[in-house]
Amino acid sequence: MTIEVKNSIKPVDYVKSIAMLEKRVDEVLSGKKNELLWILEHETVYTGGTSSNTKDLLSKNIKIIKTNRGGKYTVHSPGQKVVYFVLNLNKRDKDIRKLINQIENCLINILKEYKILSYADKKNIGIWVNNRKIGAIGVRVKNTV
């Protein structure tokens, strides 16, 4: 199982990145392309999940993009690293909770290298430091990819 690793240096437009990821999902499903791990930053934008409400926004001057993911709002901006995985779960363990735990443990170990004590919360997905979220995790699966 070969995973292509892509690291974008300049901020990537959120809408364009999602279109590229959706195309890659279809290519992985059809066997045309390898799985992908894409590290990038986005231009400043709020993404609103299915539970988002504009009254929760801290700034009304930032572009808002509605998404089909769960959750409320997430702000993306230059300097904030985002890692997207496009994985074929037919070739891997299909346990999504296990995958999320592996990602959480990876983030905890990276922060530990910088002497930052962090933890995963059983009730709230993500990584936390002193009761404040430092790392968000979102997962979307389409036909096992």
Predicted regions and their residues:
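N-terminal lobe of the biotin/lipoate ligase/transferase fold
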Residues: 1-129
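Catalytic cores of processing enzymes, dominated by hydrolases/peptidases
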Residues: 132-145
